[in-house]
Structures are given as C-alpha cells and as structure tokens.
C-alpha cells in the first residue's frame, strides 16, 4: 500500500496552495457579483446559441457541399451511356460496381450520371472501376462458321448509393435516355462473342450433292489433332480439329467421304441453321492453284460433315489434302462443366479424345446481400436464311436473393443504338418467363429446355408488367422477388451489317429499407471462327512420276484477339502438321479483318494465358497500330470488387505496421461526417497489437471552446488499481484555449474497475498553458462502467503534427454509456507524440445526423439543422441591461472557482488512493 503524501515539495506544493486559494476567492467574488447585481436572469442567451449552432451549421454545410451524394436521375447526360456487349459476355457490375464498377471499355462509362431531384430507374452512381473486355469481331466470309464466343468480364456497378425515393426504379417514371445512361455508369456487364459478323447474310446453301459413292474406304485420315482440349465456352472458347487425308484409289466427281462429331461437340456453335434445312456450308477444299477439289457441308442434326469431290479428281491420282475445322460445345448435350468423350469419326476411322468444358458460372452479380445479379447468353443466331432471328437466355436473380422493386431491362444494343443491329420491340421480340424451382439445377451452358420440370412458365403473370416504352429496350417489372427466373428471348436483328450486340440489366433495392440501390448488367456480342482446307493430286497421265501432293496444312484459326477481360480465352491458332501453303482463298485466313469497336489494327502475336478475373470496363476507342509481341503468362485472379471511391487528401506519412488483432467488429457506420479542417502532418509509426472488445454507447454533445496552453513536465510512473464508483453531476461549459506541446511516451497497462455515473454540467473558462513532457509508465487495471450523460458540441480546429509511436497492448472491456453535456470550443495546437492503440466503436452524437455509407467515401450531410435553428430560435426576453455582462462574469467566476475546487478535491482523492 502506498504512503499518502499530503504535501509535495517545492513547486507542486506551492502550486496546489495557490490554486486552492484562487479557487476559494473566485467562488466568493463570483457569488458576490452574482447575487448582488445579477437579477436579470430572464434574458435569453440566444446569441451564444446562434453562434455555436452557426458554426456547426457552417461545418455541416461545408461538409454537405463537398460530400453530398448525388443520386443520379433519369436525365443523365448521353455521354454517360454505355451498354453491355453481346456474345462477348461482359458483366457490368456495380461492381456495383465494381463494380458490378466502372467499366472502362465498351461496356460502361465511368462518368457519374448528372443528377436531378429524383433518381430514375437506371441512372446510378459509379462505385467501382473495372476494366471490361472489348471483343473484336471478325468479318465473315461466305463459308464461315460461327459460335457464340463468350467473354465474361464482371465489372461492379455502383450499388451502395441510397435511393431517396424507392419508386425511382419504376420504369414509367424514367425517360428514354435513362436506360442508356444506366449503362453509362459502373454497371457490371459480361460480354459473349459469337464468332461471326452480320455484314453479309449467308444464302441458303443445300448440302453438297453426294450423287456418287461413299468412298470412306478409299480415304485414309492421319495426323489428327485437337488444338486444345480444355476451354470455356462461355468465354468465347472453342477448339479446332485438324487432319490430313489421302485418297488411296481413284475417285470421281460426286464421290464423297464423311466425318462425324460426338454429342458433346458441334460444328456450328451458336449459329442457328434450323431455317436453312439444318445444313451449314463449309469452306471449299481447294488446290494450290485455286481449283475446288471438294465441297463440304455440315448437317446440324446428324453432326456429320460431307466432303463431295468435284470433277477436279477425275483425272488425278495420289490425292492428298488437309482440313482444319472449328469445334464448339453442344450446350444442350454438355450443360455442365466437366470432361466429356470427344470421339471423332473421319472416313470410318475413330479418333478417341476427351474434352473438358470449364463454363464460366452464369451465377454472377454484386457481392452483397441485396446485390443485383443477372447474366445472359446468345445461344442461337440465324445468319443464313435471311429471317435474321436470334435466341437469348437470361438468368434473373440466379443467386436467389431477397430483392425489392426489381426491374430487368433487355436491350438490343449496348453503348449506342446505332452500333448494333439488334431490334427489341413489341413486334420484333417474344419473351417467355419461367420460375426456377431448384436454382442448383440450372445449366452452366445457359441451355434451358422449356419442357424441363424444373421450370414453371409464368409468362401470363407478366402480361401487364412488360413495357417497350424506350427505344430498343424491353423493361420487365419483377417487383419484390425471392426466386430465380429464366427469360427466353426470341428476337430479331436488321440488315445494316452491324454486329449483334445485346445487353441485360437488373436493378433493385433492399426490400426492407427501400434503400441500398443496386444495379448489374451483362453484355453479349458475336464474332466469327473460320474453317477450311486444301488438297491436291497428281495427273493420271504420268503415273510413274507422280508429283507428291502437299501434306496437310490445317487451316490456321484466328489469332488471339487481345481482350482485357477476365480469363480471356486465347483464340485458336492451330497449325498442326504444317504442309505446303494451301491456296490462300481456300484457307479463309481469318487472322485479320478484325471488325473491332476499338478500331485497333493490332498485329499482336500475344500468347496470353491470362486467367485474369479483372472486371474491366474499358471504353477504348483507341485507333492504335500496335505491333506487339507479348508473351504474357499471367494468372491474375483479381476478383477485385473494389468499391473504393475514396476521395482522400491525406498528407499522412503513416508507417503503420499494425498487427491489429482487432476483433473489432467495427460496425463503423462511419459515414464519416468528418468535416474536420485538420492539417494533420502525421508521421505515425503505429505498431499496434490491439485486442479491443469495446461496446461504447457514447451520446456526446460537446460544445468545447477550449484554448489551453499547457506546458507540463510530468514524469508519472503510476501503478494504479482504481475501483472507483463516481457519481458526478457536472455541467461543464469549458472555454479553454489549449496549446499543448506534449511529448508523451506512455506505456500504460491499465486495469481499472471504475463505475462512474457522471452527469456533469461544468462551465469552465480555463486558459492554461501546458507544455507537458510526460513519461508515464502507468500500470492501471481499469474495468470501467461509466454512465456519462455528456452533450458536447465540439468545434475543434486542430493542427496536429503528431508523431505517434504507440506500442500499447490494451485489453479494455469497456461498456460506456456516456451522455455528457460539455460545451467546449477547443482551439488546440497539439504537437503530440502519442503511441495509441485504439479500437473504438462510437455511435455518432444524438444531435447530428448519421450519414449514409457511400462507396466513394462521400457523406450526405443535411443542412436542415441550420435552417431549423434559425427558424426555431427563442424570442428575445427580458431587458438588455448593462448588468448582463456583470451577471455572466460573476457566474463564470463562481463556476471557475468551483471547478478549481473540484480539481483540488479530485487530486486529494487520488493521493488518498
């Protein structure tokens, strides 16, 4: 037990006596003045309140000016519009957002939409910036094969912005420009590319006339190869098969041989030939002189290629040739990711293979409880019959979340209407809507069978909830939903020769709060894959001196198109078994002529094995002639749903090696209303290991006008075990001007069990100059349960140059309910070197509005407080006499004396302890 010291030596003792004396005198003088001449207590002190409130309102107004969340509206500028591309699946995420998002490519623009009073359905704020892949389409030749090349690049969209009016999602309230503007912000969008160009509609081509004999027994296939055996069909992935063939005997015009694909593969991809006798034309096999050696077709139903020889072979022997053909997934027969048999029969010779489909998951959206989630795929495009139709599958709410006021927009374009051939209208579009019983049974390939028992058609329930009020947009009002839906789209495109680009968007709110607006989108587009072959033979005139035919030179597939999307599937570049150059016309060399929205002549030989999940929305209309040879083997799995729109001007050189074990489930709804003009040049080396489980309910309204100049040299080595139960009712109005230059190295282990109920109303006008160099090694065990009712309005302008090295291990279990009424206006210039490890969860003051969370860190302050105080100010009462100042001075002197006495007693109490 420590010995009590009543009197300290020298300075401290004298200082204590002097302060005690001054306090007593102040009480006496203040009481005399107060009771002698202070009789005008009826006069209202509205001036000080106005001043205080004005400063608060000014701060609030400034904060409001800088941090207000502008909820985008329908009338967003056209510059913000950007849509999602078609069979290149590109997810516009908001990101949220991340998208969601802003997408920087052709998916969505990142500029925030201009906002008006009421936000409209699709105008949204940008939350996260993500790069979206821009797929380049390849011009189509007469005999080209098409698949839906899907490239998913999920980009988060703005999702966390609040809706001021939950009805802003209602389509009837939106303007035509709104839908495109919704894309202009950071919507997540995913692109799918179908390998084709709609520049020229293919004529209806019947199967090659096979009037002759099946000569499979006279044809020998060799050097069979698959360009790759693993790919992602939803990311525009496909493979090529290449083979040589030799005719071992004489054949004549009309004779033919065949090749047959297994169930897991198709030769037509996502191109629909059902209106063209289910027959797809294949590029002719030509000789090196350009003569047609064989014509080829592909039967969609039987999955059989037929190669019919022309009269070129009538006088030829030793006919050798090769072919290279693109292969695609069969979405109906291979609906899930996995490995399938891929046994291919060429001229009755079986080549056994395995092929693995790694479908990108169609379950995509904003990663939060009420985040919008949607995806789509173009699964069939009619390019041959002239009917110009396409089929699209849309998964709505595949994450099966509880969503409110849900809208889905199906668009026939992405960024601009004039850049797509898609047509969405009541006459051009047929929609069927199905409710999903078991979401886990949805296919990975986007194939949906209307007769599947897992799907329940509910189209009739949406008859009055489908709108075509905006150009090239179908809007579906789903409302409050908890289930997953499948929308089957049968649409049309025009003959303008432009690529078919579509986009789907979902937006919704939290059904409980009608806030927390979320939006997510998905793009689809089409590109082309080419196939062909070559062959030659010797003349029968000189059988003894045959000219050897060219060995197989498989048709090179298109070079990989640079696509800054996640998991870009390198485009096929198969050249197995190189042979003499086949006729260039027969090779249908599709390495060039990339009809890319980006206008890029990129002769780029890029081996990009990049598994990048980068949600990039790149709107790059860059006309760049880049001859780049890049071997980038980047496995970047960056699912960066970075919703960080942080506008932080912090000149802080913080070397924070913080090993923070902060089990602080910091519910810091820190919609940080920090309109603090703090010039903090803080070099903080904080190695903080803080295990703080703090439940603090501090409702503090502090008006602290403190100007304190404290020069204190305190070396305190205190080991205090304080179990203090203090009930203090103090009302403190402290006007203190504090200039404290304190260098404190405090290694404090404090275990204090204090139960303090402090209702403190203290009016303290203290001018203290304290220069404190305190080395306090205090071991205090404090378990403090403090109920302090403090109302503190603190207008603090702090210029703190703090170099804080805080190595504090604090285990503080504090339950503090502090309602303290302190009026302190503190102008503190504190140069403090503090080592602080704090983990606090603080509830904002009662009289200040809590700002909503914003992904950009913007806070929406309200200036209603200022207006209200101006309106509700108390009328002036009483006489404005000259004695008012004397009364106030007396009261302040009395309170100052009380405060000094109180501090003296508190010091005595500590010394006794």
UniProtKB/Swiss-Prot annotation:
Biased composition (Polar residues): 44-61, 68-95, 120-189, 841-852
GO CC field: extracellular region
SUPFAM superfamilies: Bacterial adhesins (SSF49401)
Major location category of this protein: secreted
Compositional bias annotation for Low complexity: 96-119
Biased amino acid composition, Pro residues: 545-555
Pfam families found in the cross-reference section: Big_8, Gram_pos_anchor, SdrG_C_C, YSIRK_signal
Stretches the record annotates as Disordered: 44-192, 530-885
Motif (MIDAS-like motif): 272-276
Compositional bias annotation for Acidic residues: 556-837
A single GO BP: cell adhesion
Signal peptide per UniProt: 1-44
Gene3D superfamilies: 2.60.40.1280, 2.60.40.1290
Expression triggers: Expressed on cells only at early exponential phase with aeration.
Function: Cell surface-associated protein implicated in virulence by promoting bacterial attachment to both alpha- and beta-chains of human fibrinogen and inducing the formation of bacterial clumps. Partly responsible for mediating bacterial attachment to the highly keratinized squamous epithelial cells from the nasal cavity via an interaction with cytokeratin K10 (K10). Also promotes bacterial attachment to cultured keratinocytes, possibly through an interaction with cytokeratin K10. Binds mouse cytokeratin K10. Activates human platelet aggregation.
Domain commentary: The Asp/Ser-rich domain functions as a stalk to allow the ligand binding domain to be displayed in a functional form on the cell surface.
Protein name: Clumping factor B
Source species of the chain: Staphylococcus aureus (strain Newman)
Lineage, top ranks: Bacteria, Bacillati, Bacillota, Bacilli, Bacillales
Gene name of the record: clfB
